């Protein structure tokens, strides 16, 4: 066996360990073989077969005789009773006749008679399709007859007892009878369909009128550009400025062509690539505020202070003094829309260069362009912005103040940088008579409350 297992001619050529392992292997096998030997004397089929044959032998022959008859038939108790009644000669049968018919036809019901016979009695008494007929005195016997209701013969589909249409009710049967009678009369008589014609015509009229109402409302609500419909309805008036901003706003306010909070916010949030002289005109006219701004001294001052305040509230890093912020700025690309905006701002005034607010409007334009420069993300001002004496002079028709042409001292720059926050506290009488934006800034009262006994006076410096 060692030679057959390892395919070696000489078993002595193997080592000690394989030899010992083989010896242990065969020794263990011999042990299990000796244990299995006495068990094989009495095999399993010899021990259990006679006992099983003796205990289950009498019932085995009966199961092979009729295995299919012991399966419950797929019919309900109502179907079984109906079969028994229909197979009777007079279409009526007693309760015992029903029992006998079921047991003769289906061997499954030969067992457990008490259970299914009780169910048969319940179905006879609870279903309206079964009618109890009293027994005639001429025929001897006990118990009444059971028959089917004449209207319940069609309760099974196509005569199959496996499927019933619905539970039979006498009320439903009487209604079906009436419907059948009406249909039969309608076929025979002619005026009955003529009476139904007005109802049919009314239905047609209702169907023709009903779709007109939603069509009319949809046309009125979704009118694209109607002149009278868009002006009369409140929804169209509310949506007119949002749909056509460039056309409706200049018609309503032909004289309002100045600056507003929306104008400064639009100039500040426009992208860097669009900062050219041409798109500055539709940008300002399209986003002008709905409230007109008349160019008087009081309204222009309040608008200017409101613009500064709005720029401060929306973004805390923007200040209104362009001279204070120009200290930290460097070079700037030269394609700016400020020169064209300055020319438009001065040309659109009512009195031209004779307006007392000419220099203030120029200051506001420069300030709005300054906000636009600082909002584009870390970019710096243009060279003409840093050197106003050399580069702004080429703009004809513009007069700049002496304080714009010269740099202030260091203290004034930081002072104006701080006073940019205080622009919301300016009143109309402080700004009305001034033509330069620096003077109302210096005379503005401080909005801070100092806890020290002395107050910080801005006008000293």
Swiss-Prot record:
Keyword Transcription regulation: yes
Biased composition (Polar residues): 230-258, 352-379
Chain intervals for the UniProt region annotation (Disordered): 166-194, 221-258, 341-380
Keywords: Activator, Developmental protein, DNA-binding, Nucleus, Transcription, Transcription regulation
Pfam family, one: Forkhead
InterPro entries, A to Z: Fork_head_dom, FOX_domain-containing, FOXC1/C2-like_FH, TF_fork_head_CS_1, TF_fork_head_CS_2, WH-like_DNA-bd_sf, WH_DNA-bd_sf
SUPFAM superfamilies: Winged helix' DNA-binding domain
Induction: By activin and by smad2.
GO biological process, one term: mesoderm development
Gene Ontology MF term list: DNA binding; DNA-binding transcription factor activity; DNA-binding transcription factor activity, RNA polymerase II-specific; promoter-specific chromatin binding; RNA polymerase II cis-regulatory region sequence-specific DNA binding
Gene Ontology cellular component annotations, sorted alphabetically: nucleus
Presence of the UniProt keyword DNA-binding in the record: yes
Top-rank taxon: Eukaryota
UniProt feature, compositional bias: Basic and acidic residues: 171-186
Record-annotated DNA-binding residue ranges: 72-166
Gene3D superfamilies recorded: Winged helix-like DNA-binding domain superfamily/Winged helix DNA-binding domain
Subcellular location: Nucleus
Cysteines paired by S-S bonds: none
Organs and tissues of expression: After the mid-blastula transition, expressed in the dorsolateral mesoderm but not within the dorsal blastopore lip. During gastrulation and neurulation, expressed within the dorsal mesoderm and the lateral border of the neural plate but not within the dorsal midline. In neurula stage embryos, expressed at the border between mesoderm and ectoderm but not within the notochord and neuroectoderm. From stage 25 to stage 32, expressed in branchial arches, head mesenchmye, neural crest cells, tail tip and in two segmented lines of cells bordering the somites.
Role noted for this protein: Transcriptional activator. May be involved in the dorso-ventral patterning of the mesoderm.
Protein name per its UniProtKB record: Forkhead box protein C2-B
Organism: Xenopus laevis
